[in-house]
């Protein structure tokens, strides 16, 4: 059951969503950017050696640790730097007031606005990965570098999907999906 504070916040938040906002388009843009980026990366991978494949689990674990750290140290703490403060505001002051333990579900696709990151966040995440790509390309191999950015980008897309699943009604897929 929704409390009065959460009802009021949801009503206020929803009233500020632009009339042209389309949740399906929002998600489509994110995944078009991500899948296009992955397609470009994969075009550069050639004759991967067995040990280069180790990049995937190593970077996958590192990405999850990074997400945990970011969530704990930035998304739940009002830091002074403007960029971090914006992340905190969006996550803690919007997302965690919109959704609570009592009500985690979307009403409709307009509610996706408070759940999915803006599409430019994926672009920023890709840009943050580029120095790692350059270093790995220089120090190890180009395959390791491309597998690195494939993993960071894929982790972002998987995170968005899994987070979405946290806010939909319980169903067979959500219950049995192996993540």
Predicted regions: what is each one?
Residues 152-179:
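Cytosol-/stroma-facing membrane-proximal "stalk/adaptor" domains immediately downstream
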